[in-house]
């Protein structure tokens, strides 16, 4: 369970018998989290998304975290994800290039200095457990996408390639069609 600013997150096991406090991030609002096997080693790793508006003067507070699971112990990976300086609202897994590993879609939440202005969202390609943003003219729709509040991976046009539907404040429902990876 992610925590709002001032409260640590809590990790519960599947049956709710054990809980473990996630400390060290109480100054950050954790807006989303997702378990997935980022390095294809058979266990679930954890991506924690940072968001909120409380840290307008501390952009470092918006650094997401990727926790790598090794034999049930999670360690923070310092070098597998890029620097994130804009509050996020959703993190999704998607194998957009159908190469067999899970890539990430990170949505932007707000422009801290201009509420209402559209912000970027990012698609991160998974290369052996490390993530880098996908750039280029085929991904211009992610620039200034909007103040996204929710997103879902779906195959809208039934072409066997995953697309993404997004909704948000002051924006239209938007479909990001995958043009074959």
Describe the residue ranges of each PLM region.
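Predominantly five- to eight-bladed beta-propeller fold
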Residues: 61, 106, 117-122, 128-130
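Blade-edge motifs of beta-propeller repeat domains
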Residues: 1, 7-28, 65-86, 122-146, ...
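Beta-propeller blade termini
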Residues: 29-40, 80, 87-98, 102, ...
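Hydrophobic beta-strand segments that make up the repeating blades of beta-propeller
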Residues: 1-4, 46-50, 104-108, 163-168
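Short, small-residue-enriched loops and turns at beta-alpha junctions
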Residues: 54-56, 112-113, 139-142
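Short, solvent-exposed loop/turn segments at conserved positions within beta-propeller repeat blades
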Residues: 6-7, 56-62, 113-119, 168-171
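Beta-propeller domains
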Residues: 138-180
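A generic tandem-repeat structural signature
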Residues: 26-69, 74
């Amino acid at each position: 369970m992610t925590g709002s600013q001032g409260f640590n997150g809590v990790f519960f096991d599947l049956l709710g018998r054990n809980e473990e406090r996630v400390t060290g991030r109480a100054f950050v609002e954790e807006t989303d989290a997702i378990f997935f096997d980022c390095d294809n080693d058979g266990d679930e790793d954890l991506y924690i998304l940072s968001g909120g508006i409380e840290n307008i003067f501390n952009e470092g507070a918006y650094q997401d975290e990727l926790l790598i699971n090794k034999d049930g112990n999670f360690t923070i990976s310092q070098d597998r994800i890029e620097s994130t300086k804009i509050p996020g609202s959703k993190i999704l897994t998607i194998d957009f290039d159908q190469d067999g590993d899970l890539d990430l879609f990170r949505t932007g939440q707000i422009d801290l200095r201009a509420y209402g202005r559209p912000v970027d969202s990012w698609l991160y390609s998974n290369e052996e457990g490390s993530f880098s943003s996908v750039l280029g003219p085929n991904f211009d729709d992610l620039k200034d996408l909007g103040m996204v509040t929710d997103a879902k991976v779906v195959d809208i046009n039934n072409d066997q390639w995953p697309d993404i539907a997004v909704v948000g404040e002051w924006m239209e429902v938007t479909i990001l069609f995958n043009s074959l990876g």
